[in-house]
Amino acid sequence: MKIGIIGAMEPEVAHLIAAMTNATSQTIAGIEFIAGTLAGKDVVVTRSGIGKVAASIATTLLIEKYAPDAVINTGSAGGFVDTLAIGDIVISSEVRHHDVDVTAFGYEIGQMAQQPAAFIPAAHLVEAANKAIAQLGEVKAIEGLICTGDSFICDPVRTQAMLKNFPTMAACEMEGAAIAQVCHQFGVPFVVIRSLSDNANNDSPVDFDSYIVKAGYHSALMVMLLLEQLK
């Protein structure tokens, strides 16, 4: 079994790369792909860069060049659930674009034309993530809707507008739905694992800078524990 792991930023993949053995690297289109062993599994880890286009390019290259059996998106996110604190984790129950609107043609808000409204992660990956929760210690983890858009959300007015469109949203970030859409088209199972770096409010820029390393570590820890659960 080979697992592809994608994070957007260095703090989101650094702990994973440091824990790998037998690592080899190649760079394609300016994106570094590091293949090796992690938690007893063959993995390929890459830092995609920020945003949906960067994530789509990296995911396509990962699938085409390495043919992973599954893809895990790891990293940070802004939180939308009062019961979660910075550093806690959201496991995707579904993933949607929050900044897509082609409702004029009969699609749901957030649904890209000719695509499903929601991208559903692989059940066996979600199950493995849930089994790993018990080993997280004080870090809390839940399943929930993760939404994606090409914006860093730090405006309470925009936050409320997003919640009006997606009232069950647990977290938002900038890559997950793009990765999920590419996986959907290639028929590759996926899951998104995100640790909260901020709470999508006025303090988000300060919180993000302060807590991105913590969020990256917690998300990476969750990914490694998930890998241990996979058979």
From Swiss-Prot:
Described purpose of this protein according to its UniProt entry: Catalyzes the irreversible cleavage of the glycosidic bond in both 5'-methylthioadenosine (MTA) and S-adenosylhomocysteine (SAH/AdoHcy) to adenine and the corresponding thioribose, 5'-methylthioribose and S-ribosylhomocysteine, respectively. Also cleaves 5'-deoxyadenosine, a toxic by-product of radical S-adenosylmethionine (SAM) enzymes, into 5-deoxyribose and adenine.
Pathway annotation: Amino-acid biosynthesis; L-methionine biosynthesis via salvage pathway; S-methyl-5-thio-alpha-D-ribose 1-phosphate from S-methyl-5'-thioadenosine (hydrolase route): step 1/2
Biological processes annotated in GO: L-methionine salvage from methylthioadenosine; L-methionine salvage from S-adenosylmethionine; nucleoside catabolic process
Family (UniProt): Belongs to the PNP/UDP phosphorylase family. MtnN subfamily.
Catalytic activity field: S-adenosyl-L-homocysteine + H2O = S-(5-deoxy-D-ribos-5-yl)-L-homocysteine + adenine; S-methyl-5'-thioadenosine + H2O = 5-(methylsulfanyl)-D-ribose + adenine; 5'-deoxyadenosine + H2O = 5-deoxy-D-ribose + adenine
Residues at the catalytic site: 12, 198
GO terms under cellular component: cytosol
Top-level taxon: Bacteria
Key words of the record: Amino-acid biosynthesis, Hydrolase, Methionine biosynthesis
InterPro entries: MTA_SAH_Nsdase (IPR010049), Nucleoside_phosphorylase_d (IPR000845), Nucleoside_phosphorylase_sf (IPR035994)
Identification of the protein by name: 5'-methylthioadenosine/S-adenosylhomocysteine nucleosidase
CDD domains documented for this protein: MTAN (cd09008)
Binding site for substrate: 78, 153, 174-175
Encoding gene, per UniProt annotation: mtnN
A Pfam match: PNP_UDP_1
Species per Swiss-Prot/TrEMBL record: Shewanella putrefaciens (strain CN-32 / ATCC BAA-453)
GO molecular function: adenosylhomocysteine nucleosidase activity; methylthioadenosine nucleosidase activity
Assigned EC number: 3.2.2.9
HAMAP family the record matches: Salvage_MtnN
